[in-house]
């Protein structure tokens, strides 16, 4: 418990020498009474370029009301936000992962510059969540994340659809399985309003993670963006931050090794996005908590997959709310012994205490009981082998084949692979290789939802696999192996795969191998020459020079 709630902001607001600062703040409308109170930063990721974050301006207003009611003075600021869905399949997607670290930097800079006493970060689209968490952890002042909520599903010909179905329809049209008119109907119906993409894709995966890890108040994320209850969620969050400030509860108090294990278990139990691997590795680094790829595989092996959620399952994200919310997921984790129930959360209560308050909707089958899981192990697998010595990641739902040996179809960019798929050049049993799309090589490690959806839409989802040093959208399904490390641009074995080489994927043995002798692989690696950097100046060049391997979270490393 802290007795000085203004121990940071008084440096900005108090005393004769700060008259200039007060004069400028009064020009905005703040009064002496306002400036005598604790200053609460409202880090907003509102932006007008996507539905995911479009509701955050209105949500921020309710948060600020709650802060004022509880005795604080809110000050709102904004960060950048890049939409994966809007930029997918273009050069713009290279900015997405890079924005995660820029968001972290901007929140850190604002916190250090204005010396806020506490911070609430309003987040929604994929990279805003880990970026904000990383920034708060660096500052380590009282604070937490508030998720804007999921979009409602669209409806087309009697079934629920999401953005995933739009991308898969593009592939179906290219394969002659759907008309352009039907694609237009799906396009017009898939996204009916505000909110983040509506399956257990990356945004909802990370929103779940943040509640289970303890950095978001449990019971807030599952409330959909357009639901009238969201106003109350925002107001109560504004009140809660003042309580968190009084208790002096900081991110690094919450982000223990046990909390990270809980977070990984939540990804496994819900069939969450492989992007969670990158983001949790990066967040653990900021928190000073040892975490490796192997931890994800170990925890996933012992955690059942219980949530029947898109992209591979039946339900969209709003059904989690209807089933009882993330509290029910927490209860499954705690009751099954898959999570550390004594881990503290931002409310001051333990995960077990929060889970005990879960109110499950009778008869719901979105979050299955522990004695009837979709499959007994989680969806995340970490593969190694001579093609991925430092590791790679794949997400499974349970219906995919576990062994595939086939010829490599090699592409040095996402665009080249997409052209081959929509041009009908990919055949059953092919293994598509997309390289030079890693953190350094892209740069920015683009998501491949357009490619993977085109494969599925063309009817090849069960017969074609994909291997890449890029990454995947949370909406991806099928045997799609990403995050291959070392990446091709660092001279990883992916760089020396040739068209027609045999690749062997054995998911049961957690391996992905190039079927060549060690001598042949060594000779090819010796002869390999790195390509010229794709950017020579600006943020892309700087990122490419400083970014670490995907196996380390693709974080920026200080030279």
UniProtKB/Swiss-Prot annotation:
Its cofactor is [2Fe-2S] cluster; Mg(2+). The keyword Lyase applies. The modification N6-carboxylysine is found at residue 127. Pfam families: ILV_EDD_C, ILVD_EDD_N. Homodimer. Belongs to the IlvD/Edd family. This is Dihydroxy-acid dehydratase. It comes from Roseiflexus castenholzii (strain DSM 13941 / HLO8).
């Amino acid at each position: 418990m802290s007795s000085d709630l203004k121990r940071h902001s008084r440096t900005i607001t108090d005393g004769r020498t700060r008259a200039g600062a007060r004069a400028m703040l009064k020009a905005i409308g703040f009064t002496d009474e306002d400036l005598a109170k604790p200053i609460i930063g409202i880090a907003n990721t509102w932006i007008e370029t996507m539905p995911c974050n479009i509701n955050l301006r209105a949500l921020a207003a309710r948060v600020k009301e709650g802060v004022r009611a509880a005795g604080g003075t809110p000050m709102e600021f904004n960060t950048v936000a890049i939409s994966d869905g809007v930029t997918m399949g273009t050069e713009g997607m290279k900015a997405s992962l890079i924005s995660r670290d820029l968001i972290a930097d901007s929140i850190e800079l604002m916190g250090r510059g204005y010396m806020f006493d506490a911070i609430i970060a309003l987040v929604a689209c994929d990279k805003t969540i880990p970026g904000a968490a990383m920034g708060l952890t660096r500052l380590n002042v009282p604070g937490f994340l508030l998720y804007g909520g999921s979009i409602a599903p669209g409806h087309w010909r009697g079934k629920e659809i999401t953005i995933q179905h739009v991308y898969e329809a593009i592939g179906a049209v290219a394969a002659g399985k759907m008309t352009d008119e039907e694609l237009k109907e799906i396009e017009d119906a898939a996204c009916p309003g505000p909110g983040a993409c509506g399956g257990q894709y990356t945004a909802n995966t990370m929103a779940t993670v943040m509640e289970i890890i303890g950095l978001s108040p449990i019971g807030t994320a599952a409330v959909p963006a357009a639901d009238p209850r969201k106003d109350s969620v925002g107001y109560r969050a504004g009140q809660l931050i003042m309580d968190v400030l009084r208790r002096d509860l900081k991110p690094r108090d919450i982000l223990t090794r046990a909390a990270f294990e809980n977070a990984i278990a939540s990804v496994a139990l819900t069939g969450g996005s492989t992007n969670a691997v990158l983001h949790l590795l990066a967040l653990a680094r900021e928190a000073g908590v040892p975490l490796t790829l192997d931890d994800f595989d170990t925890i996933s092996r012992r955690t059942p997959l219980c949530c029947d959620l898109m992209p591979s399952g039946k339900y969209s994200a709003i059904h989690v709310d209807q089933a009882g919310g993330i509290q029910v997921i927490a209860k499954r984790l705690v009751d099954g012994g898959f999570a550390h129930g004594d881990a503290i959360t931002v409310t001051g209560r333990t995960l077990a205490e929060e889970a005990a308050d879960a109110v499950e909707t009778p008869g719901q089958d979105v979050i299955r009981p522990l004695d009837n899981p979709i499959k007994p192990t989680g969806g995340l697998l970490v593969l190694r082998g001579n093609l991925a010595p430092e590791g790679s990641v794949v997400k499974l739902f349970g219906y995919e084949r576990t062994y595939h040996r086939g010829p490599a179809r090699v592409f040095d960019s996402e665009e080249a692979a997409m052209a081959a798929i929509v041009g009908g050049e990919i055949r059953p049993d092919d293994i598509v290789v997309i390289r030079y799309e890693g953190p350094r090589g892209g740069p920015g490690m683009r998501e491949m939802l357009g490619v993977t959806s085109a494969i599925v839409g063309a009817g090849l989802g069960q017969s074609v696999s994909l291997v890449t040093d890029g990454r995947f959208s949370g909406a991806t399904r099928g045997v799609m192996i990403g995050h291959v490390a070392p990446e091709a641009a660092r001279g990883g074995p992916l760089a020396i795969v040739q068209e027609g080489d045999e690749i062997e994927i054995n998911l049961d043995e957690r391996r992905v191998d190039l079927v060549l002798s060690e001598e042949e692989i060594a000779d090819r690696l010796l002869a390999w020459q790195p390509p010229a950097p794709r950017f020579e100046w600006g943020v892309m060049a700087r990122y490419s020079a400083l970014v670490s391997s995907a196996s380390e979270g693709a974080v920026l490393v200080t030279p």
